[in-house]
């Protein structure tokens, strides 16, 4: 396949890097807000294949991104395991605070039927891309077990997830059990996405940087290695991108020990240093500050130029260091793509 992102994930450095953006389908787009209003709720949108496929494709139509990423959420996995999830307006995800007894109550029997609408979305998007945008790669994704566990144990978003970390330190065997169950479910979930049409998989470990090096090895690197190995055994041609956000120097361990094809860099990572830390064949993805994108203009141009120079000659997918913020003018995204493709 000659798709630019697949070429980079095979270890090829392209003169113009392919580009897609985390949260490229989202509230900054007026067409997204229209569909979201129709759906009435985030879950109503994420579990409606027609609408979810539509918002997945919106940034492809508008900007010509090199990849479409499934419109969903990292917490759809606990939802599919029967673990209560709702999105409170203005507050984000809310879940019951997990206790040890809840670990064995996670309902694997409902996983496949509950993810069926999400898989239908993947299939719809892949079919439309093949017809209308054949150079565009479809990315499926999941939250990594540690990050998903953070939301489950703390009961939603929390500053530095103190309850999760306390639970992990004081009851490591139980926490191991939770991570193991989520690892198993993640393999099933991501494998189903490939079977439905995903060409690349991404593992988001948004809170990996909260852990000590010892805990990082146990609850970030080891599960990522297990997930990647299982997926490559089932789907040898499907590349995996890992994103251990805020991992700092532990990015090196993650890149060399997990088997991923590419590593996502958050905004704090110096791309020139990242190149030295990862094996030459491992692609890097990132890492423009989303606030530089929001600002646009000269500030954005300086940052883009710096990243491009640092990554010249290395396999690179241009992206952000975190998701697009809702206040971003769509014109700035168009300006970014023009900038990347004309430098």
Curated annotation (Swiss-Prot):
Its EC number is 4.1.1.37. The keyword Lyase applies. Keywords: Cytoplasm, Decarboxylase, Lyase, Porphyrin biosynthesis. The lineage of its organism: Bacteria, Pseudomonadati, Pseudomonadota, Alphaproteobacteria, Acetobacterales. Belongs to the uroporphyrinogen decarboxylase family. This is Uroporphyrinogen decarboxylase. InterPro entries: UROD/MetE-like_sf (IPR038071), Uroporphyrinogen_deCO2ase_HemE (IPR006361), Uroporphyrinogen_deCOase (IPR000257). Pathway: Porphyrin-containing compound metabolism; protoporphyrin-IX biosynthesis; coproporphyrinogen-III from 5-aminolevulinate: step 4/4. It is an enzyme of class 4 (lyase). Homodimer. It comes from Granulibacter bethesdensis (strain ATCC BAA-1260 / CGDNIH1). Catalyzes the decarboxylation of four acetate groups of uroporphyrinogen-III to yield coproporphyrinogen-III. The record marks 73 as: Transition state stabilizer.
């Amino acid at each position: 396949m000659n798709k630019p992102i697949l070429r980079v994930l095979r270890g090829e450095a392209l003169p113009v890097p392919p580009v897609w953006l985390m949260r490229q389908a989202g509230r900054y787009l007026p067409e997204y807000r229209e569909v979201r209003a129709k759906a009435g709720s985030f879950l109503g949108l994420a579990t409606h294949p027609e609408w979810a496929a539509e918002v997945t494709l919106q940034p492809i139509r508008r900007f010509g991104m090199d990849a479409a990423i499934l419109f969903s959420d990292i917490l759809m996995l606990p939802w599919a395991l029967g673990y209560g999830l709702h999105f409170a307006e203005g507050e984000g995800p809310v879940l019951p605070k997990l206790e040890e007894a809840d670990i064995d109550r996670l309902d694997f029997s409902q996983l496949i039927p509950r993810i069926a609408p999400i898989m239908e979305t993947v299939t719809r998007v892949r079919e439309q891309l093949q017809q209308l945008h054949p150079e565009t790669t479809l990315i499926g994704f999941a939250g990594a077990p540690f990050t998903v566990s953070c939301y489950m144990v703390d009961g939603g978003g929390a500053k530095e997830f103190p309850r999760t970390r306390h639970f992990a330190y004081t009851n490591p065997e139980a926490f191991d059990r939770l991570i193991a169950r989520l690892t198993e479910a993640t393999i099933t979930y991501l494998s189903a996405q490939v079977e439905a049409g995903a060409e690349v998989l991404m593992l988001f470990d948004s809170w990996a940087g909260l852990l000590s090096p010892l805990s990082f090895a146990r609850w970030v690197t080891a599960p990522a290695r297990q997930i990647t190995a299982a997926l490559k055994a089932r789907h040898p041609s499907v590349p995996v991108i890992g994103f251990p956000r805020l991992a700092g120097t532990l990015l090196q361990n993650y890149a060399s020990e997990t088997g991923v094809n590419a590593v996502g860099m958050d905004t704090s990572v110096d791309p020139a240093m990242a190149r030295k830390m990862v094996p030459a064949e491992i692609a890097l993805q990132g890492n423009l500050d989303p606030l530089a994108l929001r600002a646009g203009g000269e500030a954005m141009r300086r940052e883009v130029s710096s990243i491009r120079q640092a990554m010249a000659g290395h396999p690179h997918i241009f992206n952000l260091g975190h998701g697009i913020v809702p206040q971003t003018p769509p014109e700035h995204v168009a300006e970014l793509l023009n900038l990347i493709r004309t430098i």
